[in-house]
């Protein structure tokens, strides 16, 4: 039996990123594989005709490459942390239907997937929690979720496409709270400069009726802008299109590599990594 998804619902907003990850898997098989996305889309009853039509456009295909690189970069950082903290908590902030935690599973870590209650309800149906895994309904801005994470063996948190929808002050409060609660932990997420955030915001600000885009979280120089938030933070960043992979694969055109450089350098599309130092 297929799970029906209606148009203009919260569930629909989760299906489209899933479709992007399936498209990445088809277009760039040497760079990215998301078998979960392919499998889940087979279980869903939804009219993909518009998405399929758009998938042939140049920018849609480049957007799929962006999604692939972002997921790969975040997975790289999670796996790097697990090498030195094999029993750590792996925490997917704003998980949607993303299965990166399970993809990084080393057989010993604990996996937590956090999102709003209606999202977690759908996730439980399509991606029920497995061994050493919990799907936790919460509001990321409310620190009540901190207590649900067993960080005894360390903790690595990652957020994909999440903080563009947070005010700068909200990200700052979250990071400071996490530094208190999870000393020795690491947070990795994607970010971009003000120009890029304005472009992202164009699509959703109209519906949200928000005037002040400038209040939303954007970063150009992560180390100099975020380090002053708290003396315990160890901040670094890498370009998210070319910072982890040179994209010299036959599936990626020279024009797309050029766009990738524009993204990393002009839009400051980056993966930010924040280490939480020990309590002072």
Language-model features: where?
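A short, conserved alpha-helix within the catalytic core of class I
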Residues: 165-178
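Rossmann-like AdoMet
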Residues: 1-91, 95-138, 151-152
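Short alpha-helix
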Residues: 213-240
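A conserved beta-strand element that flanks and buttresses the S-adenosyl-L-methionine
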Residues: 157-158
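Short, glycine-/aromatic-enriched active-site segment of Class I SAM-dependent methyltransferases
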Residues: 198-213
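Conserved catalytic loop of SAM-dependent methyltransferase domains
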Residues: 232-258
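Conserved beta-strand signature within the Rossmann-like core of class I S-adenosyl-L-methionine
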Residues: 181-194
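Short amphipathic alpha-helix with an adjacent loop that forms part of the alpha/beta core around
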Residues: 143-152
